[in-house]
């Protein structure tokens, strides 16, 4: 491994670097400065002169132990910036997380890779606002969503979270990418009003399901479901954190040949509208599949409408065609009162007849029969 040469200054630096990790470099230094290596010309193996062996025998043993200890530490070493991703985050794809981690500092560049999302706010913010206003009997002008509690799942840098907060809502934005949340927190700090209305957390949806069950008036998952690895679990969690009668808003990409051609081949590989690897066609979901899963979890789909993006103008507009992007709005069913059992109803009718029997002879005769 060492080609019969002395472990010189570079080797000493290597051991010194490993020193803070707990390796005993003091035991290795005598070997570096005094041990003599002789290369066997026939076998190419390493040998030590007999006179030197006795003198440095103890040093050799200590040094080998030191080196092996250091190598074991190297095997288990993890750079401090290499984030560990919990396996309990069942819907979070670690590959997707790494993709967005590399772009975390670009969220608020309106001319950068997230320009389409900035432009999408022209559609999705009114879409959310107008549908929520249908559930609010009286709203305050200028702050129409005042009093509403909204969860923005996969909030990224807060591009949609902030407009919802400006409409008066109390918004919690969650994202599994720590750098995304740092960017979002930094940006909202420039607006004291938003700083009070918006809260950001580094977590997945599954991690807050129990503590936030039936807490939110609305859940928003915009451009998120095409990145999760377990769609059914994700949507089930969305339903669980909604109040009865709460609203769920989703924008995503349909799973069609057209979406593959334009959403991946053109947008990523040709025009570079979004970075390569941002989307995986297999994760795209059709409106029919989405509606089926939502209805199985007690949500009723109210609206599905297509969205089209013009890469030349940079604007979005609504469309009847849902072959590419689309928005969906669903409402969680309200808790229904359980109907009284037949036994309970019969018992009530009997007690009523007995009470009337005291004053009505006809009823008394009826009970005898």
Swiss-Prot record:
Cofactor(s) annotated in UniProt: Mg(2+)
Protein name: Ubiquinone biosynthesis O-methyltransferase, mitochondrial
Organism: Homo sapiens (Human)
Compartmental location: Mitochondrion inner membrane
Positions contributing to S-adenosyl-L-methionine binding: 124, 154, 175, 222
Coiled coil location: none
Pathway assignment: Cofactor biosynthesis; ubiquinone biosynthesis
Membrane topology annotation: Peripheral membrane protein
Subunit structure: Component of a multi-subunit COQ enzyme complex, composed of at least COQ3, COQ4, COQ5, COQ6, COQ7 and COQ9.
One BP term from GO: glycerol metabolic process
EC number(s) reported in the record: 2.1.1.64, 2.1.1.-, 2.1.1.114
Main function: O-methyltransferase required for two non-consecutive steps during ubiquinone biosynthesis. Catalyzes the 2 O-methylation of 3,4-dihydroxy-5-(all-trans-decaprenyl)benzoic acid into 4-hydroxy-3-methoxy-5-(all-trans-decaprenyl)benzoic acid. Also catalyzes the last step of ubiquinone biosynthesis by mediating methylation of 3-demethylubiquinone into ubiquinone. Also able to mediate the methylation of 3-demethylubiquinol-10 into ubiquinol-10.
Positions that bind Mg(2+): 223, 226-227
Main location: mitochondrion
Catalytic function, reaction form: 3,4-dihydroxy-5-(all-trans-decaprenyl)benzoate + S-adenosyl-L-methionine = 4-hydroxy-3-methoxy-5-(all-trans-decaprenyl)benzoate + S-adenosyl-L-homocysteine + H(+); a 3-demethylubiquinone + S-adenosyl-L-methionine = a ubiquinone + S-adenosyl-L-homocysteine; 3-demethylubiquinol-10 + S-adenosyl-L-methionine = ubiquinol-10 + S-adenosyl-L-homocysteine + H(+)
GO cellular component, one term: mitochondrial inner membrane
């Amino acid at each position: 491994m060492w080609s019969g040469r002395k472990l010189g200054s570079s080797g000493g630096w290597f051991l010194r670097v490993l020193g803070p990790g707990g390796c005993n470099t003091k035991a290795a230094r005598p070997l570096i400065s005094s041990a003599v290596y002789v290369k066997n010309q026939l076998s190419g193996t390493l040998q030590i002169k007999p006179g030197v062996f006795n003198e440095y025998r103890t040093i050799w043993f200590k040094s080998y132990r030191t080196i092996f200890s250091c190598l074991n530490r190297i095997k288990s070493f993890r750079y401090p910036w290499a984030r560990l991703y919990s396996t309990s985050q069942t819907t979070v794809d670690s590959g997707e997380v790494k993709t967005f981690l590399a772009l975390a500092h670009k969220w608020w560049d309106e001319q950068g890779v997230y320009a389409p999302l900035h432009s999408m706010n022209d559609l999705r913010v009114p879409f959310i606002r107008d549908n929520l206003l249908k559930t609010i009997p009286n709203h305050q002008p200028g702050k129409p969503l005042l009093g509403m509690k909204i969860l923005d799942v996969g909030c990224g840098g807060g591009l949609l979270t902030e407009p919802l907060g400006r409409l008066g809502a109390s918004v919690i934005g969650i994202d599994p990418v720590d750098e995304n949340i740092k960017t979002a927190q930094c940006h909202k700090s420039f607006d004291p009003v938003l700083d009070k209305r918006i809260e950001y957390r580094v977590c997945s949806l599954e991690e807050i399901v129990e503590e936030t069950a039936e807490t939110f008036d609305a859940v928003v998952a915009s451009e998120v479901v095409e990145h999760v690895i377990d769609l059914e679990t994700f949507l089930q969690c969305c339903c669980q954190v909604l109040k009865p009668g709460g609203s769920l808003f989703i924008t995503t990409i349909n799973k069609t040949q057209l979406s593959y051609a334009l959403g991946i081949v053109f947008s990523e590989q040709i025009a570079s509208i979004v970075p390569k690897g941002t989307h995986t066609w297999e994760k795209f979901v059709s409106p029919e599949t989405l509606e089926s899963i939502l209805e199985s979890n007690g949500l009723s789909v109210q609206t599905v409408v297509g969205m089209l993006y013009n890469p030349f103008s940079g604007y979005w507009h609504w469309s009847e065609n849902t072959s590419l992007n689309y928005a969906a709005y669903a409402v969680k069913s309200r808790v229904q009162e359980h109907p009284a059992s037949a036994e309970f109803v019969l018992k009530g009718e009997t007690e009523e007849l007995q009470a009337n029997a005291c004053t009505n002879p006809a009823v008394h005769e009826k009970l005898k029969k």
